[in-house]
C-alpha cells in the first residue's frame, strides 16, 4: 500500500524517512487558522482536515497528516506573520514552560479506516535577552514555525530542557507514529 504524507513541511518529510524510505508528498490545502479551540483540539482538528483534504485526491493508500501547535498556559501561539509577532511570541516563551502538541491523523483508503492521536511535549526556555531575540528573528528561522522557533535549528540555544518526545517538537512524533502504523500492519 502506498504511503502519503499530507504536508509541505521539509522537517516532517525528513522525519518520516526514519520510518519509510519511500512515500509520496501531497501538500494539503487547509487554512491553518487559530480557532477558539484548546491546543489539543486544534492540533487534532487541523490534522484531520489535512488528511480529509488529501483523501479527496487519492483512491487508495495510507495518509499521514500532522499539525503542530505551541501553547503557553493554554494560549495557542501559531506561526508568526511578521517580526513584531515573532518578537512577542519569543518574549512570551522566554524563561517559561510551554507545551508542544502534535495532532496526527492516519487514514487508510479505500477502507476508510481512521485513527487520530495527540502527542504532547513540555519545553522550558532559558530567559532570553532582547538582543538574542532580535538576532534570532534576523536569522529568519522563526517564520514558518509554530511558536516562532525551531528546536532543530538555532532555536535549540533557547531550550533549557524538554520532557517528552524531541521529534514531536520538530513536527512529527516518529516513535509513536511508528507504533500506531505497526498496529495497522505497516
From Swiss-Prot:
It comes from the Bacteria. Gene3D superfamilies: 3.90.950.10. Its main location: cytoplasm. The keyword Cytoplasm applies. Pfam families: Maf. The active site is at residue 67. It catalyses: dTTP + H2O = dTMP + diphosphate + H(+); UTP + H2O = UMP + diphosphate + H(+). GO terms for molecular function: dTTP diphosphatase activity; UTP diphosphatase activity. GO terms for biological process: nucleotide metabolic process. The keyword Glycoprotein does not apply. One of its GO terms (cellular component) is cytoplasm. It is found in: Cytoplasm. Keywords: Cytoplasm, Hydrolase, Nucleotide metabolism. Belongs to the Maf family. YhdE subfamily. Nucleoside triphosphate pyrophosphatase that hydrolyzes dTTP and UTP. May have a dual role in cell division arrest and in preventing the incorporation of modified nucleotides into cellular nucleic acids. NCBIfam families: maf. PANTHER family: BIFUNCTIONAL DTTP/UTP PYROPHOSPHATASE/METHYLTRANSFERASE PROTEIN-RELATED, BIFUNCTIONAL DTTP_UTP PYROPHOSPHATASE_METHYLTRANSFERASE PROTEIN-RELATED. This is dTTP/UTP pyrophosphatase. The lineage of its organism: Bacteria, Bacillati, Bacillota, Clostridia, Thermoanaerobacterales.
Amino acid at each position: 500500500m502506498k504511503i502519503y504524507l499530507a504536508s509541505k513541511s521539509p522537517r516532517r518529510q525528513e522525519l518520516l524517512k526514519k520510518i519509510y524510505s519511500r512515500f509520496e508528498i501531497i501538500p494539503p490545502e487547509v487554512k491553518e487558522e487559530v480557532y477558539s479551540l484548546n491546543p489539543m483540539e486544534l492540533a487534532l482538528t487541523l490534522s484531520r482536515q489535512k488528511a480529509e483534504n488529501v483523501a479527496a485526491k487519492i483512491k487508495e493508500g495510507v495518509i499521514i497528516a500532522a499539525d503542530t501547535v505551541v501553547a503557553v498556559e493554554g494560549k495557542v501561539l501559531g506561526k508568526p506573520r511578521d517580526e513584531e509577532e515573532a518578537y512577542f511570541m519569543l518574549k512570551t516563551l522566554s524563561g517559561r514552560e510551554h507545551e508542544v502538541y502534535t495532532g496526527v491523523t492516519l487514514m487508510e483508503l479505500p477502507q476508510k479506516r481512521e485513527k487520530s492521536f495527540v502527542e504532547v511535549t513540555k519545553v522550558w526556555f532559558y530567559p532570553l535577552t532582547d538582543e538574542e531575540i532580535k538576532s534570532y528573528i534576523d536569522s529568519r528561522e522563526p517564520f514558518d514555525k509554530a511558536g516562532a522557533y525551531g528546536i532543530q535549528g538555532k532555536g535549540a540555544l533557547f531550550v533549557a530542557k524538554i520532557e517528552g518526545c524531541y521529534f514531536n517538537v520538530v513536527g512529527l512524533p516518529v516513535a509513536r507514529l511508528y507504533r500506531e502504523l505497526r498496529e495497522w500492519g505497516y
